[in-house]
A protein has these predicted regions:
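IMPase-like, lithium-sensitive Mg2+-dependent phosphomonoesterase catalytic core
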Residues: 1-48, 58-59, 71-261
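Short beta-strand-loop/turn "lid" adjacent to the catalytic site in phosphate-handling enzymes
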Residues: 53-68
């Protein structure tokens, strides 16, 4: 029996002390984790509870069919984050406009961007799906967040990560000081450190691409994919194609095993 289990709460508190944080970022992550636990529970019942499956008959801003669980997860993450006083504005793949914090709640110093349920069209066929999130410091002085706060480049991210809902539910995140993964232990309802200090192998053997888009690729992209398939590449043998159609699942595999997305 392992008595050295490190919970996410302990890990984030250790990190907070190490870098002198105030706890605001920790509070945001805690709420993301709460929402993820609820989503994980709903996904686990997707084949049993009929009103979870299927689409709602409209498309999102990306032109994708909106699934019922998309709508549920989107509202869940918004409601988990909008009242805690640590966030000034949010943006979601499921929303056309910025998500403002209600007037009755205090505004914080962080901006949260998320895709509540990536790969949701895979729900009906029991394929891995996930949540993607990124967190920025606001750049405006205070009050309601603005479009300027939202449209920051990726290099300005304060922290980012994803949750994959699969045979197990795993959270992977980084603040620029290493990458750590936590698995949800259903027996206690807590995320525990399962993948400490993740490093991607220097050389993998997998590439992940939707080759149905081949006719629309630029010539350089086509040539690169053909290079990976050939024996002329640095592996001296063809790469293996693995494409699930859920970014979180494809990226997670390639992060752990090595590969190209």
């Amino acid at each position: 029996m392992n008595d050295r289990i490190i919970s996410f709460d302990r890990h984030i508190m250790d990190e907070q002390r190490r870098y002198g944080g105030r706890g605001d970022f920790s509070s945001i992550l805690s709420q993301i984790i709460f929402a993820a636990k609820v989503v994980a529970a709903q996904v686990a019942h997707a084949g049993i509870v009929e009103d979870i499956l299927g689409n709602v008959g409209r498309t999102n801003v990306q032109g994708e069919e909106v699934q019922k669980l998309d709508v549920y997860a989107n509202k869940l993450f918004i409601n988990a984050l909008n009242y805690i006083g640590k966030v000034c504005v949010m943006a979601s793949e499921e929303e056309k406009d910025m998500i403002m914090i209600p007037a009755e709640y205090p505004k914080g110093d962080y901006v949260v961007m998320f895709d509540p349920l990536d790969g949701s069209t895979n729900i009906d066929v029991d394929v891995s799906i996930g949540t993607i999130f990124g967190i920025f410091h606001r750049i405006t002085p205070g009050g309601d967040g603005t479009l300027e706060d939202c449209l920051q480049p990726g290099r300005k991210l304060f922290g980012a990560g994803y949750i994959i809902y699969s045979s197990s539910t795993i959270l992977v995140y980084s603040t620029g000081h290493g990458v750590n993964g936590f698995s949800l232990d259903p027996s206690v309802g807590e995320f525990v450190l399962s993948h400490p200090n993740i490093t991607m192998p220097k050389r993998g053997k997998i590439y992940s691409a939707n080759e149905g888009n081949y006719p629309y690729w630029k010539q350089g992209t086509r040539e690169y994919i053909e290079y990976l398939k050939s024996e002329r590449n640095t592996r001296k043998g063809p790469y293996t194609s693995r494409y699930i159609g859920s970014l979180v699942a494809d990226f997670h595999r390639n992060l752990l095993k090595g590969g190209i997305f």
